[in-house]
């Protein structure tokens, strides 16, 4: 456990939708660097000598992730490498020139992977069904393979705080389980560590930063045609909550870091089965209380004025 809920809540920004609109670029950069740096430090995401593969999709989140990591790299107490990787999934109309030109302008090492996962998803998933799950699995496998080839020890993804909260409520409402996106995890093949350095960053910061930086955003034609996804409904719910009570989302995220298994109901996380008290079966309940308890006086004294009823004498 990393600290009390109150302390944890202060480490993360409250819902900043109104506040962020008035922020200047420098203020936004400092805030993003601060939140990202905290997450990296809290979970030891990046260590000395790491070669970090930054997955770049062409969306606002991954652009911001690369930008912030490049800034942190210049002043970090540890030395690490960054390699940007994009997967060209052969979606119709995908502007293949945008990312290579952008990455070349930054002078950052990069690699463009090419795989026609678009056709696979279109062929396998029926019309009107959600394509995100299969698309994600195919993409993940290709990225793991690329990380292996390039000798990358860490794989950095652009998921932010609100992505994590959305996943939590999706699992809660539709899956019947308490689970979200962890800030750090071992990859499926066990060879790499996947990190989410933007885990503390609320989405409005990234929306505003993308506008101010004029990132060359590339829309996803697979997801953009599915407006009724459950995740989008959850997103709308969280956005409304944030407007009603600005600290609510920060407090929910803090709760994910402050789990108390003994106050839930999962028998695998807490041994409820073997949980017993000190009173033995058949023992006189008042005499059992003669031993001083944590409050410093015999609990039996509290019961001294209570009339005892013996069913045998009734």
From Swiss-Prot:
Sites where the protein binds [4Fe-4S] cluster: 132, 135, 223
InterPro entries with a match to the protein in the record: Rossmann-like_a/b/a_fold, TilS/TtcA_N, tRNA_Cyd_32_2_STrfase
Pathway membership: tRNA modification
Keywords of the record: 4Fe-4S, ATP-binding, Cytoplasm, Iron, Iron-sulfur, Magnesium, Metal-binding, Nucleotide-binding, RNA-binding, Transferase, tRNA processing, tRNA-binding
Gene3D superfamilies hit by this protein: HUPs (3.40.50.620)
Cofactor: Mg(2+); [4Fe-4S] cluster
EC nos: 2.8.1.-
GO BP annotation list: tRNA thio-modification
Cofactor binding: number and manner: Binds 1 [4Fe-4S] cluster per subunit. The cluster is chelated by three Cys residues, the fourth Fe has a free coordination site that may bind a sulfur atom transferred from the persulfide of IscS.
Residue ranges of the motif PP-loop motif: 57-62
GO CC term, one of those recorded: cytoplasm
Catalytic activities: cytidine(32) in tRNA + S-sulfanyl-L-cysteinyl-[cysteine desulfurase] + AH2 + ATP = 2-thiocytidine(32) in tRNA + L-cysteinyl-[cysteine desulfurase] + A + AMP + diphosphate + H(+)
Compartment(s): Cytoplasm
Major location (coarse): cytoplasm
GO MF term set: 4 iron, 4 sulfur cluster binding; ATP binding; magnesium ion binding; sulfurtransferase activity; tRNA binding
Family per similarity comment: Belongs to the TtcA family.
Function of the molecule: Catalyzes the ATP-dependent 2-thiolation of cytidine in position 32 of tRNA, to form 2-thiocytidine (s(2)C32). The sulfur atoms are provided by the cysteine/cysteine desulfurase (IscS) system.
Subunit structure: Homodimer.
Other observations noted: The thiolation reaction likely consists of two steps: a first activation step by ATP to form an adenylated intermediate of the target base of tRNA, and a second nucleophilic substitution step of the sulfur (S) atom supplied by the hydrosulfide attached to the Fe-S cluster.
Name listed for the protein in its UniProt record: tRNA-cytidine(32) 2-sulfurtransferase
Classification lineage: Bacteria, Pseudomonadati, Pseudomonadota, Gammaproteobacteria, Chromatiales
